[in-house]
Amino acid sequence: MASQPPEEPAEFQVSDELECKICYNRYNLKQRKPKVLECCHRVCAKCLYKIIDFGDSPQGVIVCPFCRFETCLPDDEVSSLPDDNNILVNLTCGSKGKKCLPENPTELLLTPKRLASLVSPSHTSSNCLVITIMEVQRESSPSLSSTPVVEFYRPASFDSVTTVSHNWTVWNCTSLLFQTSIRVLVWLLGLLYFSSLPLGIYLLVSKKVTLGVVFVSLVPSSLVILMVYGFCQCVCHEFLDCMALPS
């Protein structure tokens, strides 16, 4: 197994977050306040003033040195940009000792003791307290989370759907059986029709005159009927066409 790289200490990560990524100086509560641009990058106020003095950005706009995103200045003042509240809290706690630093630099657990340590007579010049409010999610009990819960839902119309499906299956089977029977009957009639002439001759030879005449005359009579039907159909079409012509 490949060994994982050693993780950096939490104190080093916190100190790295408290440094400006341009001048690498530590943020403070005076000239180097952490300012947040619209692209969510943090730059100290002193570096922002230098960027404005260099004239690289248009009037009333600051171009982010990291992603070149333009941030509008509300009053053409760097002080109008929002501060990074989490870093301000860390800076305030850092002046009180390491025990005030939270485990997660983006979270601040509020307790009466911690609030008392933040607000002291030595901070009479401060007129605001920055607080990050987070919603704590309640963890479910281990007994419930370890056991999978499976719910079965049976709709009220389940029985009716089953009945309709069964009836549809029966109807399909009946329809298929009927179609098969019709096909078999048509094949039998066709076989009887085409074999009627030799069968009639055989019956005449066997001295069964009546049946022999019927079977022998079946094919010619059917052909005559078809010819008469076709002739009548042609006459009817011609008559209808003549009636449809304008007089």
UniProtKB/Swiss-Prot annotation:
MF annotations from Gene Ontology: ubiquitin-protein transferase activity; zinc ion binding
Catalysis performed (reactions): S-ubiquitinyl-[E2 ubiquitin-conjugating enzyme]-L-cysteine + [acceptor protein]-L-lysine = [E2 ubiquitin-conjugating enzyme]-L-cysteine + N(6)-ubiquitinyl-[acceptor protein]-L-lysine
Organism (species): Rattus norvegicus (Rat)
Protein's membrane topology: Multi-pass membrane protein
Record keywords, A-Z: Cytoplasm, Membrane, Metal-binding, Transferase, Transmembrane, Transmembrane helix, Ubl conjugation pathway, Zinc, Zinc-finger
CDD domains, per database record: RING-HC_RNF182 (cd16555)
PROSITE patterns with a match to the protein in the record: ZF_RING_1, ZF_RING_2
Record bears the keyword Membrane: yes
InterPro entries: RNF182, RNF182_RING-HC, Znf_RING, Znf_RING/FYVE/PHD, Znf_RING_CS
Disruption outcome: Silencing prevents ventricular remodeling in rats after myocardial ischemia-reperfusion injury by activating the mTOR signaling pathway.
Keyword Transmembrane helix: yes
BP terms from Gene Ontology: protein ubiquitination
ZnF region ranges: RING-type: 20-68
Protein name per UniProt: E3 ubiquitin-protein ligase RNF182
Entry EC no(s): 2.3.2.27
